[in-house]
């Protein structure tokens, strides 16, 4: 079977499909469509297929609405489409991925913070040791 992305990307040299957000809506009222598009196309330009929508403005109940066609997203990922960071985060929040991306990010931040604390503690003990030797 021919890889579907190679057939669709023939017009775009060196390109690949990306699942990303396309901006819509009005001034001060953004609305995003989740689309499968070539990475060389403009953000709000032509796309291959719309896969969902995202309304970042909270409604009267304080909810941000997300609609996803998970079957088609699974299809495009199987065809080799890349994901943008915001879409990856939305899919993690919706439970599409087994691990939410912020869990990994928070773990890395905590690991760096602990390493820095250990380094500062070691420097502090070194300076205290040199001060006691001088006195």
Curated annotation (Swiss-Prot):
Record's keyword annotation contains Methyltransferase: no
Assembly behavior: Component of the mitochondrial ribosome small subunit (28S) which comprises a 12S rRNA and about 30 distinct proteins.
Gene: MRPS16
GO terms, molecular function: structural constituent of ribosome
Subcellular location: Mitochondrion
InterPro entries, sorted: Ribosomal_bS16, Ribosomal_bS16_dom_sf
Example GO biological process: mitochondrial translation
Keywords annotated in UniProt: Mitochondrion, Phosphoprotein, Ribonucleoprotein, Ribosomal protein, Transit peptide
Transmembrane segments: none
GO CC terms, sorted: cytosol; mitochondrial inner membrane; mitochondrial small ribosomal subunit
Phosphothreonine modified-residue sites: 130
Transit peptide per record: 1-34
Protein name: Small ribosomal subunit protein bS16m
UniProt source species: Bos taurus
Record-stated family: Belongs to the bacterial ribosomal protein bS16 family.
Coiled coil: none
